[in-house]
Amino acid sequence: MNSSPGPAIALFLMFGGINGDSVVQTEGQVLPSEGDSLIVNCSYETTQYPSLFWYVQYPGEGPQLHLKAMKANDKGRNKGFEAMYRKETTSFHLEKDSVQESDSAVYFCALS
């Protein structure tokens, strides 16, 4: 029996911040196979208590809010993705247990 690997999912990663605050996330192109789990790191530096966001831009579309967390220990969820606002580690990592071809997009982390 001849089986071929499933389609690759392309995730392009960007970041954003304001007023001297900064966000650092996984850079470049990530190519998981369909069904793979995914973690996209997002860490931030700020002197405030920020709200945290993940945005997504699908091919041929403008950016749109993917998920958000307004305070520590909030968990944003959307389309099988989730991200936990972890104040103690200043992180908001985007995770999904099983990526699909329809997840191919540009993802970026931001704070306000």
Swiss-Prot record:
<dbReference type="GO" id="GO:0042101">
    <property type="term" value="C:T cell receptor complex"/>
</dbReference>
<feature type="domain" description="Ig-like">
    <location>
        <begin position="21"/>
        <end position="112"/>
    </location>
</feature>
<comment type="subunit">
    <text>Alpha-beta TR is a heterodimer composed of an alpha and beta chain; disulfide-linked. The alpha-beta TR is associated with the transmembrane signaling CD3 coreceptor proteins to form the TR-CD3 (TcR or TCR). The assembly of alpha-beta TR heterodimers with CD3 occurs in the endoplasmic reticulum where a single alpha-beta TR heterodimer associates with one CD3D-CD3E heterodimer, one CD3G-CD3E heterodimer and one CD247 homodimer forming a stable octameric structure. CD3D-CD3E and CD3G-CD3E heterodimers preferentially associate with TR alpha and TR beta chains, respectively.</text>
</comment>
<protein>
    <recommendedName>
        <fullName>T cell receptor alpha variable 9-1</fullName>
    </recommendedName>
</protein>
<feature type="signal peptide">
    <location>
        <begin position="1"/>
        <end position="20"/>
    </location>
</feature>
<keyword id="KW-0472">Membrane</keyword>
<keyword id="KW-1015">Disulfide bond</keyword>
<keyword id="KW-1064">Adaptive immunity</keyword>
<dbReference type="GO" id="GO:0002250">
    <property type="term" value="P:adaptive immune response"/>
</dbReference>
<dbReference type="InterPro" id="IPR051287">
    <property type="entry name" value="TCR_variable_region"/>
</dbReference>
<keyword id="KW-1003">Cell membrane</keyword>
<keyword id="KW-0675">Receptor</keyword>
<dbReference type="InterPro" id="IPR013783">
    <property type="entry name" value="Ig-like_fold"/>
</dbReference>
<feature type="disulfide bond">
    <location>
        <begin position="42"/>
        <end position="109"/>
    </location>
</feature>
<dbReference type="InterPro" id="IPR013106">
    <property type="entry name" value="Ig_V-set"/>
</dbReference>
<keyword id="KW-0732">Signal</keyword>
<comment type="function">
    <text>V region of the variable domain of T cell receptor (TR) alpha chain that participates in the antigen recognition. Alpha-beta T cell receptors are antigen specific receptors which are essential to the immune response and are present on the cell surface of T lymphocytes. Recognize peptide-major histocompatibility (MH) (pMH) complexes that are displayed by antigen presenting cells (APC), a prerequisite for efficient T cell adaptive immunity against pathogens.</text>
</comment>
<keyword id="KW-0391">Immunity</keyword>
<keyword id="KW-0393">Immunoglobulin domain</keyword>
<keyword id="KW-0325">Glycoprotein</keyword>
<feature type="glycosylation site" description="N-linked (GlcNAc...) asparagine">
    <location>
        <position position="41"/>
    </location>
</feature>
<dbReference type="Pfam" id="PF07686">
    <property type="entry name" value="V-set"/>
</dbReference>
<dbReference type="InterPro" id="IPR007110">
    <property type="entry name" value="Ig-like_dom"/>
</dbReference>
<dbReference type="InterPro" id="IPR036179">
    <property type="entry name" value="Ig-like_dom_sf"/>
</dbReference>
<keyword id="KW-1279">T cell receptor</keyword>
